[in-house]
């Protein structure tokens, strides 16, 4: 089996999409290929068909490889709960919460598990494309590294180093990274990749030659800056601003926002613009307000209260439209109780009281794949998604369920999810990916269009669009990189 590892000079240099591109290229060339990231840190996660939790970046990479996402592609997921603590997910299940120092001391225990997981991949795939995290030059973490050079050494993988030229300083970041690696680590790096380039490559070439003279490693290509409709799991996600889009969707950007990949399908609608809101002045009067998921719902509710957004949201709810997802759904209720101090030691807190329901946080985390039908609809309106939450919400007297769940992790069930007020303008659900399917997204956006005097439109199938964008990404990267050299590095062709 062949393997290659993509590392970067920093976070957000484009490692994840380079891995996705290589997965699609190798698949197109007839090889069975699998992505692998030993440890990911993200608040954007996904639930597999067997009810296990993994990072979203490896989900996209799995699709690029033509595979169903599985947790062996991302054995360890860290989900920050505060600046100093994270929830640790190991092989899809909650391992526990820990501080940075506690996890640093834990990492050595996971090495054997990671090696065993990777061995299984070696037995089942022609090529494994690995992804590092952050930078391999974090010299203070070297002795217990399990995600960059430590992982590459564990499975004897060659490394390609990616630098982001769009931020500036790419030559210094590549040379500086190499300077901080030890001799054994330097020998693993077989090439560099310049990512997100704008302009004339001819002007860049003298710099590439000088860089090669300094670090003695060839540049395998320059990938142009390209806007693609593919999800971005990094926390500082920025939505492309459209010059004009008649449908204005505002999203509350809370400090612990999670699973904002729920919005990606909405971004694909040509006449929809999405903007983040962090203050009451920014809210204005959107056509739709979305309160997204949160890794710390109580802290984010306190944030809404302290910054004045709570009152603005309540005022907007008089004639505006609001959808809450997961933590955002919990926020819309009358009360949140935390008897086990899952999030804080407050015990309980009043919600926005826009939906007549209460949430109680439990010790056990719910991680399920679900299929649901929108209630009170004549036409077939099926939603497929997943749930990731600690709380259980209970209805009051003056509330209507939004969905009926009929399938949970492949088993037939029959229970309600979500809620909608009598007026029909405030609703919430626990289902992540609720907009990914055509039916519900088309229904909501068409209702917004009609309200503004616009014509209804058919929504495109998000999965089809994603496949086209992955092919486009692969074409760009194939044209930009020396694929013959890369095949030589991994010992193929």
From Swiss-Prot:
Listed InterPro entries: Class_I_gatase-like, CobQ/CobB/MinD/ParA_Nub-bd_dom, CobQ_GATase1, CobQ_N, CobQ_synth, GATase_3, P-loop_NTPase
Sequence ranges assigned to domain GATase cobBQ-type in this UniProt record: 246-440
GO biological process: cobalamin biosynthetic process
Positions annotated as active site in the UniProt record: 326 (nucleophile), 432
One annotated GO molecular function: catalytic activity
Known function: Catalyzes amidations at positions B, D, E, and G on adenosylcobyrinic A,C-diamide. NH(2) groups are provided by glutamine, and one molecule of ATP is hydrogenolyzed for each amidation.
Name this protein carries in UniProt: Cobyric acid synthase
Organism: Clostridium botulinum (strain Loch Maree / Type A3)
């Amino acid at each position: 089996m062949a393997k290659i590892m993509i590392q970067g000079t920093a976070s957000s240099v484009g490692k994840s999409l380079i891995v996705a591109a290589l997965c699609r290229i190798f698949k197109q060339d007839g090889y069975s290929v699998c992505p692998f990231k030993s440890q990911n840190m993200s608040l954007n996660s996904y639930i597999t068909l067997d009810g296990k939790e993994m990072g979203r970046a490896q989900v996209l990479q799995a699709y690029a490889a033509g595979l169903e996402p599985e947790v062996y592609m991302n054995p360890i997921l860290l989900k920050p709960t505060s600046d100093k603590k994270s929830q640790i997910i190991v092989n899809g299940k909650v391992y526990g919460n820990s501080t940075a120092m506690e996890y640093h001391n834990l990492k050595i225990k996971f090495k054997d598990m990671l090696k065993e997981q990777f061995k299984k991949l070696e037995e089942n795939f022609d090529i494994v494309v690995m992804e590092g995290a952050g930078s391999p030059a974090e010299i203070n973490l070297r002795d217990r590294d399990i995600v960059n050079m430590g992982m590459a050494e564990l499975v004897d993988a060659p490394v390609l180093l990616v630098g982001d030229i769009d931020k500036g300083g790419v030559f210094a970041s590549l040379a500086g990274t190499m300077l901080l690696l030890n001799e054994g680590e330097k020998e693993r790096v077989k090439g560099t990749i310049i990512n997100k380039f704008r302009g004339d490559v001819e002007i860049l070439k003298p710099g590439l030659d000088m860089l090669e003279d300094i670090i003695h490693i060839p540049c395998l290509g320059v990938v142009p800056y390209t806007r693609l409709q593919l999800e971005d799991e990094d926390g500082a996600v920025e939505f492309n601003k459209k010059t004009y889009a008649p449908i204005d969707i505002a999203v509350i950007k809370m400090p612990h926002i999670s699973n904002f990949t729920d919005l990606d399908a909405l971004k694909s609608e040509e006449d929809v613009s999405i903007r983040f809101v962090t203050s009451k002045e920014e809210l204005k009067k959107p056509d739709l307000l979305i309160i997204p998921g949160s890794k710390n719902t109580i802290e984010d509710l306190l944030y809404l209260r302290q910054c004045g957004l709570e009152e603005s949201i309540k005022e907007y709810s008089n004639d505006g439209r609001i959808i809450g997802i997961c933590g955002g759904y919990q926020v819309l209720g009358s009360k949140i109780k935390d008897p086990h101090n899952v999030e804080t030691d407050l015990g309980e807190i009043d919600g926005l009281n826009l939906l007549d329901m209460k949430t109680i946080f439990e010790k056990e985390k719910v991680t399920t794949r679900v299929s649901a039908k929108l209630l009170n609809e004549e036409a077939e309106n099926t939603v497929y998604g997943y749930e990731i939450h600690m709380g259980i919400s209970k209805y009051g007297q003056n509330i209507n369920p939004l969905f009926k769940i009929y399938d949970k992790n492949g088993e037939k069930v029959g229970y309600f999810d979500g809620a909608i007020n009598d007026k029909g303008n405030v609703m919430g659900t626990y289902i992540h990916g609720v907009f990914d399917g055509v039916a519900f997204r088309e229904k909501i956006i068409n209702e917004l269009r009609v309200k503004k005097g616009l014509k209804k439109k058919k929504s495109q199938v998000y999965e089809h669009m994603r496949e086209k964008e992955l092919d486009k990404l692969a074409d760009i990267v194939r044209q930009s990189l020396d694929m013959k050299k890369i095949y030589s590095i991994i010992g193929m062709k």
